[in-house]
């Protein structure tokens, strides 16, 4: 009887966990970052690597600091989740408790093949853009936040199906935010800074393209956009990359590169970027439970594809969810311990379907007390909304798409109204607090211009120029607002002043040409249109204005060249289609006349159903 009992007890003894058991977990969850050449400060690719760090691994996995994954389980079903499962965590803890034994190396499963740290995950890109100059991060000091402008050499508009970010020196880059600037205002800031890039965040003109949430964090895999949602990249655009960089103890040089993957398939649906949050944050010193909350009611049925929370150092808890018309609720995301150092775009495994009338809400809680170890201010100080790390933000970006193509315009217009109202309230508040800052007047003026509040915009631009008369963009924007009020002589003077300050301001040449043509000074107008095109061959408006004036002067062959250049840049340009069709149908020169092409272009015009007026460039 005793022998039987002993035997039975022996059968219940669990085998010791060896590295053979946990290696697949480490390779799946950790070596994306922790391998030679990758961003992790040390490698975990071998048994020796992992055993050397066993005590540290025990602590950071038990506290769920590593692998970094902030969303709470059960409150959003996301792709590429890095969180350890409970069973994986238990196995790692047992292995370390058992002495971190290796086991029989011949039983070790093979490590999955991984691309080189700097290899393209999606294959060879169609286009690669790079920082024009490398940037060196000092050996020591605090974290560095800097924005870089990467010019995009693109002869015509293309649809982007994927974008892949390569940090260069991966161990230095903590995360990146990426936008597209069609105005070149980011480039102007870059030119004014003697070092590569510039200090500060992305300007408002550097935007996510057409509802895409672009960014990079360590371990983040590159993914193509969802089917049918490719986005349009216009020629003349700049890629703007805001980097959070960390000193490593020695000087590190980096040069970011970004790969673009194109498709000829036009999007069948266009996602939108819905931003919930506040730009009027004002947190008193010592406040422990300052709340930012916002909500938005869907005007149509829609699908949520991804979310991206953003705040700085004082945020502690984040919650976002949806209340459906029948009263049921759904979590979108929850983060109990926000950490500014670990940001990400969280993409749902399946779109979150929300019916019309659903209220989407967010609530962030901030702690501006000494009890917050991440508070950058000691003693605590008043913290307001702003782009600097010592300021605070509170945004929830939501990538959303209308369920029906017919509802897309309704959703886009409704989101635009909300965003514009939020922006205007924020920048008016900033202006009141800092009326001597010309940039504040410019920002409010630009928002008034978008609202067609031209007199208000004119007043803000004049106030800005009273503080800084040497700003060519402000003179240009003033000229645009004056032209929209029909004050052409004053507008012409503003454009001329912009060109005195910046003779290579292509948009000012274009719009001055427009004013001169309307004044009957066609010869001078032609000179400015030619100069605008020479400076910016990718400026569709200037190409069209030049072509139209040449056509009116009977210079059909040259006009055709510029109409066709415009059509190459913007394939749905009604002016270019109409201009080419008119010349092909009416020109006397038999070598240029082409009735068949004229008829085809007229049909394209009918299909587009667009009748665009004579265009000037937009502001900035």
For every predicted segment, state its role.
Residues 439-450, 473-484, 507-518, 541-551, ...:
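Conserved alpha-helical positions within TPR/SEL1-like repeat arrays
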Residues 586-595, 600-620:
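Terminal, low-structured helical/coil segments at or just beyond the last alpha-helical repeat
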Residues 7-155, 236-242, 247-249:
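Aromatic- and Gly/Pro-enriched helix-to-coil junctions and flexible linker segments
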Residues 117-403:
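His-enriched metal-coordination microenvironments in redox/metal-binding proteins
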């Amino acid at each position: 009887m005793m022998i039987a009992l002993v035997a039975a007890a022996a059968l219940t003894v669990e085998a010791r966990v060896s590295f053979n058991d946990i290696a697949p977990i480490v390779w799946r969850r950790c070596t994306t970052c922790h391998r030679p050449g990758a961003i992790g400060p040390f490698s975990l690719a071998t048994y020796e690597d992992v055993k050397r760090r066993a005590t540290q691994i025990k602590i950071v996995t038990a506290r769920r600091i590593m692998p970094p994954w902030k969303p709470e389980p059960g409150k959003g079903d996301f792709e590429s989740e890095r969180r350890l499962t409970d069973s994986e965590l238990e196995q790692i803890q047992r292995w370390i408790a058992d002495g971190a034994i290796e086991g029989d190396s011949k039983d070790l499963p093979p490590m999955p093949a991984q691309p080189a740290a700097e290899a393209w995950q999606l294959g060879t890109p169609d286009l690669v853009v790079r920082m024009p100059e490398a940037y060196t991060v000092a050996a020591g000091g605090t974290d560095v936040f800097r924005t870089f402008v990467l010019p995009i050499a693109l002869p015509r508009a293309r649809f982007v199906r994927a974008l892949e970010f390569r940090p260069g020196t991966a161990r230095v880059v903590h995360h990146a935010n990426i936008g597209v600037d069609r105005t070149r205002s980011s480039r102007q800031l870059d030119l004014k800074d003697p070092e590569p890039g510039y200090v500060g965040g992305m300007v408002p003109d550097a935007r996510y393209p057409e509802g895409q949430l672009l960014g990079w964090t360590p371990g983040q895999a590159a993914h193509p956009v969802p089917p049918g949602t490719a986005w349009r990249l216009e020629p003349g655009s700049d890629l703007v990359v805001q980097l959070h960089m960390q000193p490593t103890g020695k000087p590190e040089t980096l040069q970011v590169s970004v790969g673009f993957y194109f498709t000829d398939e036009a999007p069948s649906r266009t996602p939108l970027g819905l931003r919930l949050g506040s730009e009027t944050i004002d947190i008193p010193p010592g406040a422990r439970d300052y709340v930012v909350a916002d909500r938005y009611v869907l005007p149509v049925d829609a699908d949520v594809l991804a979310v991206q929370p953003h705040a700085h150092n004082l945020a502690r808890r984040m919650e976002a969810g949806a209340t459906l018309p029948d009263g049921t609720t759904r979590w979108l995301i929850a983060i109990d311990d926000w950490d500014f150092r670990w940001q990400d775009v969280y993409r749902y495994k399946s779109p979150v379907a929300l019916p019309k009338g659903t209220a989407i809400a967010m609530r962030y809680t901030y702690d501006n007390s000494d009890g917050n170890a991440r508070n950058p201010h000691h003693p605590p100080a008043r913290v307001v909304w702003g782009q600097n790390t010592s300021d605070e933000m509170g945004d929830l970006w939501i990538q959303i798409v209308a369920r029906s193509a017919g509802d897309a315009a309704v959703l886009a217009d409704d989101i635009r109204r909300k965003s514009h109202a939020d922006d205007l309230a924020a920048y008016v508040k900033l202006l009141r607090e800092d009326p001597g800052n010309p940039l504040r007047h410019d920002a409010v003026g630009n928002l008034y211009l978008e609202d067609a509040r031209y007199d208000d915009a004119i007043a803000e631009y004049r106030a800005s120029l009273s503080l800084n008369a040497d700003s060519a963009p402000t003179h240009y924007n003033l000229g645009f607002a004056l032209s929209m009020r029909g004050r052409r002589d004053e507008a012409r003077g503003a454009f001329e002043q912009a060109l005195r300050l910046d003779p290579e301001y292509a948009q000012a040449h274009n719009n001055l040409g427009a004013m001169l043509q309307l004044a009957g000074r066609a010869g001078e107008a032609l000179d400015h249109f030619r100069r605008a095109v020479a400076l910016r061959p990718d400026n569709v408006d200037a190409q069209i204005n030049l072509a139209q004036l040449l056509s009116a002067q009977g210079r059909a062959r040259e006009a055709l060249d510029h109409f066709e250049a415009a059509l190459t840049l913007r394939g749905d340009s009604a002016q270019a289609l109409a201009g080419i069709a008119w010349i092909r149908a009416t020109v006397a020169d038999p070598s240029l006349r082409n009735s068949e092409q004229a008829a085809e272009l007229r049909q394209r015009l009918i299909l587009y159903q667009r009748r665009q007026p004579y265009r000037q460039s937009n502001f900035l």
